[in-house]
Amino acid sequence: MKFHNYWELVLGNKTKIKVLRTLFRYAGKRFSVRELAHLSGIAHPPVLRSLADLEGMNLVRKEKHGPANVITLNRKSNLYLPLSALFLWEKEAKEKLIQRLTVLLPPVKMAVLFGSVQTGSEEIGSDIDILLVTANKRKIQDQLSEVRFKITEEFGNFFSPIVLTEHQFKKAKKRPYALTLARNYKVISGSDLIKTWWKQ
């Protein structure tokens, strides 16, 4: 392996990052190159090219198993711990957002995360969609400006809350966004009023 300026070689393109993400997700698993390519969502040839560099950096081991090569993550590699921490941080990114929202949001009847961030289909510029149900809509709206500033400052995404009274929430059951929301959401605080009022 190299000992200086090696991150370009390890993480230098999307293919390598996707391959490493798969290897760390299934640490200990033995892969054929074809299986590794399939799980990583990448074509076979670029995976082969990436594996040559990763093997050279002592991150993967390649063994002959009959006519095929078997790939395993080298968990004794000097680079295993920093990369493990990197992918763990990525895996927990949404949970860190939820933890911050739990701290920052004012007390409400219900706060839920929904939309692309919840489903995992977000893009770089996607909004953070939050639904809040409260007895005092105006008071909560006034308190959200500081939350919006802090969330955007920390995560870079625009904070996009929908604030409803309990009466408005009950009436919103058949709106298009409500039908989508009810299929995939995460309760941040308060009670699950979606299950109580929308799914009756």
Language-model features: locations:
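Short His-Asn-centered micro-motif
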Residues: F114, V133-T134
